[in-house]
């Protein structure tokens, strides 16, 4: 019989700076060797629970505690952060903030250096764990020079080398491309089988986590545990949608088809879903949708054979890249990390100049436009809003671009007020920006661009790190902007966003435009998925596993029907 390794008994925690508890009456037992997924909307208490487990609460973040919590048999109120660190290893969402060493090898060895382990033993351990996480060929590289997935593996190895009993992963998929995310979940599964450690995963992307099995899913909201059950049982219920958490798309498809999920087996295992009514009902539902071809607007932006390299003797980051963007389109730009997506946006904005090729704006040569002149036509919103914000107050921040352009004060007041209404920020117009959530700050940065009345808006990962509720709010807001005539390009790793909200996808790979097609066509093309480090949509995988006659048409049907359900 497995022993408890983490227990919370009627546990509540309230930060000193807050008027109400963040965790309320938590009753929870996690056993040795379990793999547990913790999900919930932003502010649900997930991170606070994790900080109680790894000792940051109460050692770093102080507050009032009621009840008891023990980790590896130690009361967290009586145990130092140092002592708990031997039992709990944490891999942070921001891996750059976790690096210590100048090389991968040094970073992995850091914990052993602190423990004064003999060098021969240390080298042996570094070699062992670097092989497990497939970094043994990169030991002399700087961690900062690696891809997002490789950086995460460095952090994993640095934690694993300490042989902690409990491994805590904080949003391990947040900054990874789809294939790297899938590889990360497989690696976590391999590590758990190898070490028999207890694994806790905090993550928004439920469907992506379930590509490997988990023992339990804990659903949190408003500081309490709403549900604690197996994945199979949870997916039969409406708990996820009630709590504003995205359920797997194939589960939504079965609901649309009127399938009784209580009669479905292996609901948490995509390739093994079965039930007497599943195939006939899905077949009946998946008739080809009647679709009206969208009429393209006039040409807005055209790139002709554009090439760029950062180093004169280095590889081309963009190579003979050609594409045409039309007025009113909403397009996703996808591809693995380092594919050239960000370079493409920098060239369009004029931050860097290509060595060859043409850029045309409404048929006119764009190369002679200054950055300021381009900024009047193109808005660029960075992934992290904190890197764009200059002022303390919302109204001042949104007005800044107009002030710098010497726009008359009366016109500034009128335009800023109008944009704040459009962005849903008017009630907060006199608030300090520091009081806003991450998603609200993102809206402020978008508002500060929109007030300049650009025709094209480029967003880098517009929904990164947001729960499903805030994700939906952001994407609904962007759709409304698109309906107002703003052309939108989104750089994203989120295949759901690409599938559900855009009608065209540009796939970038090694600096080239690998494909320009509908999102459904992209995410059902096996060769394209492999080449660009994408991930086949679960809808297509589900349809193939069921044996539906035309999985592609089924996927198209779902996307069209789902849009109709959500937007009418």
From Swiss-Prot:
Keywords: ATP-binding, Cell membrane, Membrane, Nucleotide-binding, Repeat, Translocase, Transport
One Pfam entry name: DUF3744
PROSITE patterns: ABC_TRANSPORTER_1 (PS00211), ABC_TRANSPORTER_2 (PS50893)
Domain ABC transporter span(s) in chain numbering: 6-247, 301-535
Source organism, top-level taxon: Bacteria
Enzyme class: translocase
Entry keyword Ribonucleoprotein: no
Source organism phylogeny: Bacteria, Bacillati, Bacillota, Bacilli, Lactobacillales
Protein name per the record: Putative ABC transporter ATP-binding protein EF_2153
Keyword Cytoplasm: no
Membrane topology summary: Peripheral membrane protein
